[in-house]
Amino acid sequence: VVDGDQRIALATTGALVVDMESADLAAAAAGGPFAVVRVVVDTPGAPLLRPGTPVRGLTALRTLRRAAPALRTWLDATGPRTVRLAEPRSFCAGVERAIEIVDRALDRYGAPVYVRRQIVHNAHVVRRLTDRGAVFVQEVDEVPPGAHVVLAAHGVSPAVRADADARGLSVVDATCPLVAKVHTEVRRHARRGESVLLIGHSDHEEVEGTVGEAPARVTVVEDEESARTVEVPDPTRVAYAMQTTLAVDEAERIAAILRERFPSIAAPRQDDICYATTNRQRAIRAVSADVDLVIVVGSPNSSNSRRLAEVAARQGVPAHLVDDVSELDLSWLAGVGRVGLSAGASAPDDLVDEVVSCLSGLGPVTVTATSTGSEHVRFTLPKEVSH
């Protein structure tokens, strides 16, 4: 029991003082989460029978009323639950390769190493590499002449490469090999004089780079309505390609419309949507069939992470995308006994561990895994950092 300067000191630190009565309440909670809010208006140094006591009591009641809604939200979120982890999840081979390229470039050349755009779409990855000495820029004209620059995993247009060469930059290309494959397809069709319909989102960096391979030949098709209305100069000389991080079912619906409208359209030699995107969507679809809530860990600018949340939502399950555990909303967990959890291909898996740890703080958690396959893909590194 404290008063005076001691009370003020505790108040400023937000300390929680547990007395013997509160300890009895803790025992009654049987090891589960609990909170105790106590108001002390009587201490040896400040007896109850004095003029200021009613004021202190009324102030305490107002404080309790303000705290009550938050405590109710917290209470509703507590309880035992099962967490179903989607497998595979988190980093794909292309993301691992891109991050390793920046790490190796820093080891070999020393800081600063410049990176055009985010190496992958995840704020935590970018922050860690920044702490190591990577400098992220929007365009290569921000890089000092002669410096080392890494091109991000999403790929770039030939114009960006030309700008880098003109500045005498030492370029290390971290473009995902599966994205590079789409670039190769687009160039091949353009050289044949064919129109290319690129299924994807026009504001995504991957699409910007792919379009840049043949701007006069490529038209972006963003949705089913665009697929129904897009026109090409010669319907008999047309091909289509896909952004690698799309929702599989949505992309196929768009492609089906294009195949119906243009019977002679050339399809990709192999599905452009990458194996990791497909695998993670299949896993979250399986998880969504048996949970009350889905949480996807990933940054909001990550296309594949957003698609995971959308796939879960289309299964009729509430789904939320969070950058990390700090964005969890307790109100989502009210009455929820089964939580599905995944992470986008650019999100570190330790962020998933932090979410599980947070849920464990709200009650006993049983963790299970729902696996729809395993991944053993490994891409080689560019020669600039491979030795």
Regions found by a protein language model. Name each.
Residues 79-345, 349-387:
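The feature marks the mature, well-folded catalytic cores of soluble enzymes
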